[in-house]
Amino acid sequence: MSEAKNLFINGLWKNNSALVQLLGLCPLLAVSSTATNALGLGLATTLVLVLTNSAVSALRRWVPGEIRIPIYVMIIASVVSAVQMLINAYAFGLYQSLGIFIPLIVTNCIVIGRAEAYAAHHPVGMAALDGLATGLGATAALFVLGALREILGNGTLFDGADLLLGHWARALRIELFHTDTPFLLAILPPGAFLGLGFMLAFKYVIEQKRRQRQAQRSAVGQALRGAAPTDNHEQA
């Protein structure tokens, strides 16, 4: 398996930053009230991860080990500031909706964690791929949680998509069922904790079934290999 493929498998599933490492829970739980907000913050975090990993990797030979963490934080803060200004300029509605959670990307453990654990020890191309894979994994978790909360809470999907994609995206709004009274448990923070818990349990069940299938295939293979010499001896 190539290293690039392994990076994407780990980032999206095996070592997902949100569902396995449980990093960045503050924005994950606070912003995921709608699919649009979750997708917007996830894409912003992905862009920050790619740019930060690339910068850290490119500068790794000139960064003294004793002060590497403050330098990484300065790089992350610079990238986040640039991304924040881009969102403010081109998606002002989303900028207002996400509020303080855009600059809080600076303190996100996912970003500093990948810079320290991977980008500082690998070339620029692989570091950028690692940032992309990690960011897409976090975005997927954010989006699924946001979509579930929006559907259960308001009966809609992609409500406010125009904040992220422009006026044409209003056509993307789907009303799955009409409700005059939103389901507040899903919309408020307790719903975020419950939704994340169900997602963790679902991933655990899938992993357990996969391990059981692998164990069964391994047992069958060993049984067949053990039976082969016996069959050859009987034929002789």
Curated annotation (Swiss-Prot):
Residues 217-236 are annotated as: Disordered. It is found in: Cell inner membrane. GO terms for cellular component: plasma membrane. Its EC number is 7.-.-.-. Belongs to the NqrDE/RnfAE family. The complex is composed of six subunits: RnfA, RnfB, RnfC, RnfD, RnfE and RnfG. This is Ion-translocating oxidoreductase complex subunit E. It comes from Edwardsiella ictaluri (strain 93-146). The lineage of its organism: Bacteria, Pseudomonadati, Pseudomonadota, Gammaproteobacteria, Enterobacterales. The gene is rnfE.
